[in-house]
Amino acid sequence: EMDLSHNQAVIDFFASFDKESYLTIFSFLGLGTILTFCMQSSAALMAITMVLCSSGVLPIYMGIALVLGENIGTTITSNIAAMGANTQARRAAFAHLTFNVFGVIWVLCGFYPFIDMVCSFVGVNPHADHIDAARLSVVLAAFHTTFNVCNTAVLIWFIPQMERFVCYVIKPSNRKDEDDFRLRYIGGTSIMKTPELSVLEAQKEI
């Protein structure tokens, strides 16, 4: 088993980056995106990131930048997989990409304060030379939760605009493709006031 904390080559590589530089953050974000796309597994790269951070080799800021890249990389994979699917599948994949890219953009605008705030929630000092592996897991979990909750809290108010944007970018290949996935019987708000009719309309859709 390789002890990364005593691997001088690995230590020197990560030490060559300035963890306080946005150039470093963007570099690791891009690296996380590319590696996730190549590995086809954000979970595997997340495990590697946790090992690097918990061993003290990779600073938490750079580790979270990798995680942000993983969030984008995994959506690129789903978009490629959906290329041969129907219009609705491609739109769903693109909406996922749009959601994550938007979240990454606003996090980058206040990257260091945001990470410091998340670390303070779980009582971790991000400037410490070594972060306990158990505490690091809590930091990464807290970051993922805070990131997704905040991103959802913002974008939930812009679902109609997001839908229009996604439909504008991903156009149906033909009219029939659009009609095949449109609800014909369920629509409006009045039907929801009568559960019996709702069941009947749902049966018609099926």
Model-derived features with residue positions:
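Non-transmembrane accessory domains of multi-pass membrane transporters/channels
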Residues: 149, 156-206
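Structural signal for the N-terminal portions of transmembrane helices
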Residues: 89-102, 126-161, 168-169
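Flexible glycine/proline-rich, aromatic-decorated loop/lid segments
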Residues: 112, 119-132, 172-182
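Membrane-interfacial helix-loop connectors
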Residues: 20, 36-73, 82-88, 94, ...
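Membrane-spanning helices that line or support transport/gating and their immediate boundary helices
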Residues: 3, 48, 75, 79, ...
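Helix-loop-helix hairpins and the membrane-proximal interhelical loops
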Residues: 1-34, 52
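Membrane-interface helix termini and inter-helical loops of multi-pass transporters
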Residues: 3-17, 116-131
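Alpha-helical transmembrane segments in multi-pass membrane proteins
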Residues: 23-24, 28, 32, 36, ...
